[in-house]
């Protein structure tokens, strides 16, 4: 049986996959607003609790699982029945907005939903777990074996009916042609008399002087398993190199996560920006006792780039991706997942446009052997305590 766990369908996230890949301002405001997604952390938590409970059973009743993202049910549910085909009863899908058309019901990206393929004899067992976690659960379809994927309305009309091979067959290759634009920069020359000017420029960087931590006063110990949050020391300054969460309430093991990014360096050298981003994410985990050292760590790369905005920008992205790949291969660290937003350009009616600096944000995470042995980046108020500066750049300048 095909099962959906999570919230209702709304006119949200329509065409999100396409709009996120074009310049802001290219489409009408109505189209862009419909593509906006939502966030419902409570529903996400409920659905996650159900999935976790099923995974922790001795016999997992889940045959296949897929999250809802771009293209909504079309993408999510079709992935579940790719090998055999399936029929979805649209009358069983939860509708939060009665004015939705068939297309909007099928393709909206209202998130916090999971699609699952579950054996028929396990349906009632899964339903009890969903009721316990207060997660809405709907049996919306079944596998068919005819290698077609279809949505059928209550009146028998099928607004969507395609052969599976038409959906998952080999798509045509897209070739993008760009030219490498050589840019050269002189070594900066500093004058001690301009120290305050340099300091002002550095403090304008959001990554350096953002004051959100003063206003975002939220519960930083949700679930009670947060072993290290962003504020450290007596003054509670946001100095944490990494975040740490315990795996349970009694044990010592946990998970550490950190991030790294270097958009300023990437402006001058995209390859250096990628390497520095990975380096920052990894060095932020230096003082966390990883269970198996670097073998415990996996990375996620989020590419934020203004592709096709100007000549040479696509070539810069290629250079950055290749540099990150080569660097991680040399370190023998995997990058199993990631995300991209390749339309980081804002266009205005008068023809002006603003492009974002090409950036890769690297997230690192892995298992800790002991959450209590993570070293805090807080200086000891002791005159005899040495402070070392280790220069990883090896720059003689």
List each language-model region with its residue ranges.
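Glycine/proline-enriched, intrinsically flexible loops and inter-domain linkers
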Residues: 1-397
